Amino acid sequence: MAVSVLAAATAVAQTPSSKEFNERYQLLVSKLGPSGVGIETLLDKWEAAYPDDADMLLGKFTYYFSKSQSSAVVAKPQEKFLGEKPVLTLKDTLGNPVNYFQVTEYDDELFGMSQKSIEKAIQLNPDRLDLRFLKVAALTGYEKESPDMALSNLKSLIIYNETQHPKWVYPGYEKVDEELFSAAIQEYCFLFFKYATPVSYEAFKEISETMLSYHPSDVLYLDNVGSYWLVVKHDYKQAAKYYNKVLKIKQDDITAIKNMILLARNTSNTKLEKKYLPLLVKYSDSESERLSAKARLEALSIKK
């Protein structure tokens, strides 16, 4: 019995603390990258000793997510893919341009393993906002032009935030307020708009409308929906409705002002353009933009 107790005590003494595991992990990652040789072995040992450790689960997520990725060059007919220009353009036998884009591809099994790790981390640490956004970021990269799961997760996150009012924790930030949360959501709106695919545009609109369902006077998301109608649907009447609503709330909103000028030009509505150009002159922070708006106003005045 004495030998068994001594052996157990020795084993406990030899098991590194969670902090020590994390220090070893960070050192390896700094030298070898997130999926370097030996990192999986260390993570497995860490998991065996501390199966619910948040840093360990984050490490496993990072390892499998990194491991799942590979770079490829694919041919696409469009001039841009996911908002990026081609890395190479050649011509086919008929002389038509063929664009080649560099993309990240994913191994489904390894990606699935990364998701299991981050989901367990979220389950054990429901108020860690960084973990939730890491999951969405991974899904966004994985799904590319069709971000259905990313959209679903973002909508659920918004609803959870607005109905449960969690006390979010985000490493590196002393306090997580509504402004930070909204700014993080807007980053995904920007990304989906940049992707410029039918599915990503709809995701952009749906996220914006979900935010507006809780904050109907939020000019950031009103501008978003206006841009959807302007750029995606070319429904200028609907777009103007949203931009005018923004300007009633915030008369110096540059996004709404500039897009109303663009809308006026697209519809050859000189009267409307002359209405909004002075606002650009008044509120723009850019000297060149103000000068350009003044010159345009003068040119329109000469034409009448």
PLM region descriptions:
Residues A11-D108:
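N-terminal leader/linker segments that initiate helical-solenoid repeat arrays
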Residues K45-W46, A121, L157, T210-M211, ...:
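Canonical positions in the second alpha-helix
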Residues P51-D52, P126-D127, E162, H215-S217, ...:
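Short coil turns that delineate tetratricopeptide repeat
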Residues L58-G59, D130-A137, P166-G172, Q186-E187, ...:
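Alpha-solenoid helical repeat scaffolds
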Residues Y63-K120, L124, L134, G141-E187, ...:
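Short coil/linker segments at helix-helix boundaries
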Residues K194, P198-E206, M211-V219, N266-K304:
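Terminal, low-structured helical/coil segments at or just beyond the last alpha-helical repeat
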